[in-house]
Amino acid sequence: MGRLLLEPQANAPANANPKPKGGINDTYFDTNMVIILAALLCALICALSLNSALRCVLRITRRFTSDDQVSNASNANANLGRLAAATGLKKQALKQIPVGLYGSGIIDMKATECLICLGDFEDGEKVRVLPKCNHGFHVRCIDTWLLSRSSCPTCRQSLLLEQPSPMAVSRRDEDMVVSIV
């Protein structure tokens, strides 16, 4: 029997003391993965917050940009035109654009359909003709368009007068810069 004690146990099963599946390495990997995912989530939230904040700041500065910030008068005129074209017309200015009946002969326009809604004009239908380019549209279509933009949807010509240069201004200095032609 003494020999049996000194001999290696050949009869012992190989899986008598199995290592647990979730060993130290697996726990270490899971902890690292959680930390990495949490860091990525925080970075994503920070990037989205920064993006939103910058968009708000840009939107506010675009609204309140004044001509005093631009030193060159020609750049001021171009910037004002772009700014005004991006903001749209006020309802009072919109009412100044003439409305006529299609097919009455009074309106000088060659189009047979509204290029905003792609609907055909019918005789007796109210049509608004833009003064600078003579493009005509259904009244409700062009009113919706002009409340958000102040340019013709067909040719993109601005409906606003550009601000005169400081040298061209006479004694009569008006606050109203934007007017409908």
Curated annotation (Swiss-Prot):
Topological relation to the membrane, as annotated: Single-pass membrane protein
Top-level taxon in the UniProt lineage: Eukaryota
GO molecular function, one term: transferase activity
Assigned GO CC terms: membrane
Subcellular location, record wording: Membrane
Pfam family, one: zf-RING_2
Biological processes per GO annotation: protein ubiquitination
Catalytic activity entry: S-ubiquitinyl-[E2 ubiquitin-conjugating enzyme]-L-cysteine + [acceptor protein]-L-lysine = [E2 ubiquitin-conjugating enzyme]-L-cysteine + N(6)-ubiquitinyl-[acceptor protein]-L-lysine
Keyword Transit peptide tagged: no
Keyword Kinase appears in the UniProt entry: no
Entry keywords, A to Z: Membrane, Metal-binding, Transferase, Transmembrane, Transmembrane helix, Ubl conjugation pathway, Zinc, Zinc-finger
Zinc finger (RING-type) residue numbers: 114-156
Transmembrane intervals: 34-54
Biological or metabolic pathway of the protein: Protein modification; protein ubiquitination
Entry EC no(s): 2.3.2.27
Disulfide bonds: none
Gene3D superfamilies to which the protein is assigned, alphabetical: Zinc/RING finger domain, C3HC4 (zinc finger) (3.30.40.10)
Matches recorded under PROSITE patterns: ZF_RING_2
SUPFAM superfamilies the record matches: RING/U-box
InterPro entries associated with the record: ATL10/ATL72-79-like, Znf_RING, Znf_RING/FYVE/PHD
Recorded domain comment: The RING-type zinc finger domain mediates binding to an E2 ubiquitin-conjugating enzyme.
Annotated family: Belongs to the RING-type zinc finger family. ATL subfamily.
PANTHER family assigned: RING-H2 FINGER PROTEIN ATL78, RING-TYPE E3 UBIQUITIN TRANSFERASE
UniProt protein name: RING-H2 finger protein ATL72
